[in-house]
Amino acid sequence: MCTALSPKVRSGPGLSDMHQYSQWLASRHEANLLPMKEDLALWLTNLLGKEITAETFMEKLDNGALLCQLAETMQEKFKESMDANKPTKNLPLKKIPCKTSAPSGSFFARDNTANFLSWCRDLGVDETCLFESEGLVLHKQPREVCLCLLELGRIAARYGVEPPGLIKLEKEIEQEETLSAPSPSPSPSSKSSGKKSTGNLLDDAVKRISEDPPCKCPNKFCVERLSQGRYRVGEKILFIRMLHNKHVMVRVGGGWETFAGYLLKHDPCRMLQISRVDGKTSPIQSKSPTLKDMNPDNYLVVSASYKAKKEIK
């Protein structure tokens, strides 16, 4: 399916109110993070036996105590792997200092978090996947906290620890890539095959998201089903999966993004250019905006990025 997505009908605020639009972008960024929080909250609840939800995610973790408990729990799982003669080379097996009653925002909360981050480094978590202690304690880096926990899930999965749902989907895609060679581009006669899968939950969700809002835009941004869970989106071929039968997620690079967020970032019809002179906003009209197409007095807003603006100088 190739859908037409027009800047004329938007689910966001009017184009003339930049302040309102900025607030809308912030809400979109939070919406993009929600599936990851839900997935990790479920994972932590199962591992630690403490109820955590997406809404309470940062509040439950911000004194560092549950993270230290997570580290201790994972070490116990590593010991079980060691007993089963699985390789556990360089895995940290130590007591992690922790003040369980540390008040949120306190020095003790920062100390707990620092001890957890030190353990992560010993485990082999790359610095690029870590967050700052202040980022957790003051709730400034929810995305970085999520990415760190996902990386822990990847490492833990190697030793038999049940990983988060997103990591399971990653393994599924890796197996699919290993077992099957890339298929050739579909012929014109086969492009409509995806339309027959209307009963499929993922296909229906992809269609619904890609066609919202509907329009009659002449420059169509292509969203085309190639095979189960594999789509052509614009000029790229992407793996798309359903997380917990609820969220439509796109595998991008080494991570994940919501499908709606990906479209906001890559579909030219969903981008805005903003005048440096008067602050007025206007949609991108061309199929693929480039430097030569842009007025030097304008800059481009890419609404799915956590950096709310991209400047083209």
UniProtKB/Swiss-Prot annotation:
Domain GAR: 197-270
Keyword Membrane recorded: yes
Family: Belongs to the GAS2 family.
SMART domains per UniProt: CH (SM00033), GAS2 (SM00243)
Protein name listed in UniProt: Growth arrest-specific protein 2
PANTHER family: GROWTH ARREST-SPECIFIC PROTEIN 2, TRANSGELIN
PTM per Swiss-Prot/TrEMBL: Cleaved, during apoptosis, on a specific aspartic residue by caspases. Phosphorylated on serine residues during the G0-G1 transition phase.
GO molecular function: actin filament binding; microtubule binding
Encoding gene (name): GAS2
Record-annotated Calponin-homology (CH) domain positions: 34-156
Keywords: Apoptosis, Cell cycle, Cell shape, Cytoplasm, Cytoskeleton, Deafness, Growth arrest, Membrane, Non-syndromic deafness, Phosphoprotein
Membrane topology recorded in Swiss-Prot or TrEMBL: Peripheral membrane protein
Phosphoserine modification, residue list: S183, S187
Cited CDD domains: CH_GAS2 (cd21267)
Domain of life assignment: Eukaryota
Organism: Homo sapiens
